[in-house]
Amino acid sequence: MAAPRAVLHLGAREWNGRARRIHGMSELVTPDSSREKKRTLLQFLSDHFQDIQTLREYLLQKQISKVNRENRSFTNIQEKYGPYVAGAVFILKQGGAVKFQDKEEWIRPNNRSHFLAEIQKFQNVPVEAVDASGCAINYQGLSNLLPLKELRSLSLQRCPNLDDWCLSRLYLLAGSLQELSLAGCPRISERGLACLHHLQNLRRLDISDLPAVSHPGLTQILVEEMLPHCEVLGADWAQNLKLEPDKQPPDTSTPLSS
């Protein structure tokens, strides 16, 4: 029985020695490999971040190029068929709708082919209303609408690219424009609304839900003073100026209890 015990004891010592050597090797290798992994991870994240930035810039430039293409001037159509048809084609391609003078129905993108088939009939018919709600119109694209000198109603609500510079061009429609909607345009501020003082023929103006306007109530009051003959739709300025309950003045309409 002594021999087996000796073998077991010898095997245990040999195993413990190997374990210590392995543990020692792991202590020598682990810090270097950990630092190497950390460098590799940081390099990967750095390269990956640069790739994401490059991709974002590429997609942004691609989107800008697409918007600019959609807002190009329809010079050939205007030279061939006149400004009314060119303006109508531009709006229809943007996904909006137009209404010609003395016509009961609006022309929308779903019946654009019918309009194009009879395009010559509209050469001398003024466009009196444009609904460009949600369209990607920008400063450049407005050039297709400014020649519409008989335009009475223009809806530009929720147009993401419409900004203050765009509003500075609308004075060219001052002679005819009576209704204008700018509701929900995220890039329009008080500075752009100040440019509307040229539009003295306006009878209805919607400036509701403009997130870039810092003081909607006060802005509406100023616009109403600027356009005294126009109905201005916007924020409930009375509610915005309402005092908090603890700051309300005392009610003097009822007698005080003794």
From Swiss-Prot:
InterPro entries the UniProt entry points to: LRR_dom_sf
Q: Where in the cell is it found?
A: Mitochondrion
GO cellular component terms, alphabetically, are: mitochondrion
Q: Does the keyword Mitochondrion apply?
A: yes
Keyword hit for Mitochondrion: yes
Primary site of residence: mitochondrion
Superkingdom, natural source: Eukaryota
Q: Which UniProt keywords apply?
A: Mitochondrion
Query: Can you cite a GO biological process for this protein?
Result: mitochondrial respiratory chain complex I assembly
- General function of this protein: Required for the assembly of the mitochondrial NADH:ubiquinone oxidoreductase complex (complex I). Involved in the assembly of the distal region of complex I.
Q: Which family does it belong to?
A: Belongs to the ATP synthase subunit s family.
Q: How does it assemble?
A: Interacts with incompletely assembled mitochondrial NADH:ubiquinone oxidoreductase complex (complex I).
Q: What is this protein called?
A: Distal membrane-arm assembly complex protein 2
Q: Which organism is it from?
A: Mus musculus
Q: Specify the taxonomic lineage.
A: Eukaryota, Metazoa, Chordata, Craniata, Vertebrata
